[in-house]
Design a protein with these regions (language model features):
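Transmembrane alpha-helices and adjacent helix-loop boundaries
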Residues: 2-358
Length: 358
């Protein structure tokens, strides 16, 4: 570039923003390989291990959903059990009342949960901070009381899935022939595969959201909603989108949980301890606001539950003491501490400013 007086000016350097890295490409390949290994596991593993992994997968998916809502959008909810229970009851209603195949009912439960999340959002989004948390819990209690009134679904005592429904799940005959197992074990294998898909899907969903402009908007709202709106972010629509997305995913997870259990009751389906307190524990000890945190947290939680659950009340006391200790000495969680100390990220979501090659 030459100016009017003959002086030559340097061309401005143009930078570009990259989200894809070599590490992320390797991660995708490793993730696909790991999912394929897990998918083939029923051919070699016993039924006990399969049932344990179902639990790990759906708790991981629930933790990722709560982490997306609270850790990235700043919507700290203690009412996640609302959509777990809703999904479970919708599964029973669709299967028993409408005669729909349970696998199709799992998907439909998520879609209906997403639809019902819209009017719910218009209520709870009027609240801020701790009031939002309390409001989300109240919504869950309202759902619990409502479903306790449906006599067709067992009322307050609950009901069970009929054997005709659980023994005729789509693909069960193929699984029985392939693995030479009976109907209960075949149902566990099908449930295991769906749980694996939901866990991998939840991880992928969170990762893709955080690497998008939508993820930037969520983080901006979490840090300062007023500042985000002044920059042009529609905070209500952004929060509504993530709330509905989490509701849909959580609804499908809830439907899957009670497909495996084959029995449901209002107190169990809308349990704040099982579906929110434990999930918050997983995210807190692993690391809030990181994708890796819930993975670490669910491994720790599974190990503690497997080896210490027989101690009764002492087990819950230990969980509480561990959570308090982590919050005091490693506020960013186990993974947050490791990532800060060693500068490592399994799921890189940062954007890099790259100068083009000459």
């Amino acid at each position: 570039m030459v100016t009017g007086d003959g002086n030559q000016l340097m061309e401005p350097t143009r930078y570009r923003i990259e989200t894809k890295t070599r590490a992320s490409a390797i991660l995708v390949l490793a993730g696909v390989a790991l999912v394929l290994i897990f998918a083939a596991l029923p051919a070699f593993a016993g039924r006990g291990l399969i049932q344990d992994l179902i639990f790990v997968f759906y708790m991981l998916a629930l933790a990722q959903c709560w982490n997306l809502l609270a850790g990235y959008a700043g919507l700290v909810s203690v009412g996640q059990q609302a959509f777990v229970g809703l999904g479970g009851y919708l599964l029973f209603a669709l299967t028993i009342g409408a005669g729909i195949d349970p696998i199709a009912a799992v998907v439909l439960s998520g879609l209906i949960a997403a639809i019902l999340a819209v009017p719910t959002a218009f209520v709870v989004f009027r609240l801020r901070g701790p009031y939002f948390a309390i409001g989300s819990w109240v919504v869950a209690e309202v759902y619990r009381l409502v479903f306790a009134q449906f006599k067709q679904l067992g009322g307050g005592t609950g009901t069970s899935l009929p054997s005709s429904a659980t023994n005729e799940i789509f693909g069960i005959e193929w699984v029985k022939a392939m693995f030479e197992v009976r109907s209960p074990a075949a149902r566990d294998i099908i449930t295991y595969w769906i749980a694996l898909v939901l866990a991998a899907g939840a991880l992928s969903l969170v990762y893709l959201v955080l690497r998008s402009r939508y993820g930037l908007a969520l983080s901006a709202i979490r840090d300062s909603e007023a500042t985000a709106e002044s920059a042009g972010v529609d905070s209500f629509r952004t929060k509504l989108g993530v709330y509905v997305l989490v509701a849909a995913t959580t609804g499908m997870i809830g439907a899957l949980i009670y497909l495996q259990k084959a029995r449901i009751s209002p107190d169990a389906a809308f349990s704040v301890l099982d579906w929110t307190a434990y999930v918050i524990f997983i995210v807190v000890i692993g690391g809030v606001g990181t994708i890796e945190g819930p993975i670490v947290g669910v491994i720790v939680f599974y190990a503690l539950q497997r080896y210490l659950a027989d101690f009764g009340t002492w087990y819950l006391i230990l969980l509480g003491a561990l959570a308090i200790g982590i919050m005091l000495f490693a506020p960013k969680g186990i993974w947050g501490y490791v990532a800060q100390r060693y500068s490592v990220a399994l799921f890189p979501v940062r954007r890099m400013l790259v100068r083009p090659r000459e």
